[in-house]
């Protein structure tokens, strides 16, 4: 399976966590946290990272509701992602990000750090989890139904 230089984005109201992976899809790391100001600033910050890393794909966490529906935050994320894709001329794909921020916070606590002191660390870790989930999904064998007759 070919991999791409991809960025994982955890888009929130105040911050955007950014993660990257190598072209082989082996390693994922949190890169930075962008403090949101306005759309143009968000695009400029993400564009600089995308150009530096020669990104070909944006993997965006979509915060589905626990019942699987798209709530207001998910719809805002989709609107932002569509505009970002157009501005950067990069394709996007979505990953179900339910509970990634919670999981990221638990991981930070597990190493003895205080998540409340560095919210940006949670955003970066959540972005890394989003990107890792996408990479894992690319590795899964596709099942197109039964081969038995």
Curated annotation (Swiss-Prot):
Keyword Phosphoprotein: no
CDD domains, per the entry: YqgF (cd16964)
Keyword set, alphabetical order: Cytoplasm, Hydrolase, Nuclease, Ribosome biogenesis
EC number(s) stated in the UniProt entry for this protein: 3.1.-.-
Annotated signal sequence range: none
GO biological process: rRNA 5'-end processing
GO molecular function: nuclease activity
Ranges annotated as spanning the membrane: none
One Gene Ontology CC term in the entry: cytosol
Enzyme class: hydrolase
Compartments, record wording: Cytoplasm
Disulfide bonds: none
Protein's UniProt keywords contain Cytoplasm: yes
Family from the record: Belongs to the YqgF nuclease family.
Function (record text): Could be a nuclease involved in processing of the 5'-end of pre-16S rRNA.
Protein name: Putative pre-16S rRNA nuclease
Biological source species: Synechococcus sp. (strain ATCC 27144 / PCC 6301 / SAUG 1402/1) (Anacystis nidulans)
Taxonomic lineage: Bacteria, Bacillati, Cyanobacteriota, Cyanophyceae, Synechococcales
